[in-house]
């Protein structure tokens, strides 16, 4: 019987989350998941997103089961979220991944053709003063130069939809993004331009105010799920993304 401690008070046993209370261990339930799992960083989605998702159901849960986790805010938030989700796979390739591993995977798999497409696009953004990275795409003269920038990490290379396309093909995962723009009151699925693949696992991210990514999870069967199969993607997400199932 495998037992994994998340904190001193929370553990996973037989794919179920338990917490320590009054000298005993109790399963975490639908009504209290947000209170208990707050200890390890999980919080509810914003009320706007909860309302939007609840509208997809005839009888939504009284306590929303969607949560989000801040996996890091040092400029590598996108890569932190993806690595955290992948570490949940029972696959030796992805165990103990971190953000640098994700960046390295990109540099190992990017082709010359992809490099040329990416750098041309970045230069167009630079010309229109819409390039948000701290480096100059005109200083990049080879694929190796671009890979060096990608590997620097932090705020030097945040990641974008081109990088997401690469990650999906490299990792064989779908990446769905929920926009949470409180400044402009936008709460919609983010158009990643990537085709959904039902044979892939799926990672769901929350994109907050155009500057920060968080990992989205769903509490089900006494466990917080944040890496989904085609069958386990929450119905509300299936509806708003029009996924055929």
Region locations from a protein language model:
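Non-catalytic, low-structured ubiquitin/UBL-interacting segments
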Residues: 1-71, 87, 220-221, 233, ...
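Intrinsic-disorder/low-complexity regions
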Residues: 3, 7-8, 13-14, 75, ...
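Compositionally biased, intrinsically disordered low-complexity regions enriched in proline and serine
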Residues: 6, 20-21, 31-35, 43, ...
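Papain-like cysteine protease catalytic cores
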Residues: 35-188
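Deubiquitinase catalytic domains
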Residues: 147-245
């Amino acid at each position: 019987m495998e037992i994994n401690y998340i904190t001193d008070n929370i553990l996973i046993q037989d794919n179920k989350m338990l917490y320590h209370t009054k000298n005993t261990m109790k399963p975490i339930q639908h009504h209290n998941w947000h209170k208990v799992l707050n200890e390890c960083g999980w919080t509810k989605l914003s009320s706007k997103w909860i309302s939007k998702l609840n509208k997809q159901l005839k009888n939504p849960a009284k306590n929303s089961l969607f949560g989000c986790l801040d996996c890091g805010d040092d400029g590598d938030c996108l890569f932190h979220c993806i690595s955290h989700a992948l570490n949940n796979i029972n696959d030796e390739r992805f165990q103990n991944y971190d953000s640098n591993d994700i960046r390295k995977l990109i540099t190992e798999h990017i082709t010359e053709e992809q490099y040329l497409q990416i750098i041309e696009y970045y230069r167009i953004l630079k010309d229109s003063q819409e390039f948000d990275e701290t480096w100059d795409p005109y200083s990049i003269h080879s694929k190796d130069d671009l890979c060096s920038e990608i590997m620097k990490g932090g705020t030097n290379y945040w990641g974008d939809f081109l990088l997401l396309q690469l990650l999906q093909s490299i990792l064989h995962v779908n990446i769905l993004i929920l926009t949470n723009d409180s400044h402009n009151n936008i709460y919609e699925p983010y158009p990643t331009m990537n085709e959904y693949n039902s044979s892939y696992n799926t990672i769901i991210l929350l994109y907050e105010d155009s500057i920060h990514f968080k990992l989205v999870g769903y509490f089900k069967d006494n466990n917080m799920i944040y890496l989904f199969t085609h069958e386990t993607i929450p119905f509300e997400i299936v509806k708003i993304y029009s996924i055929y199932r």
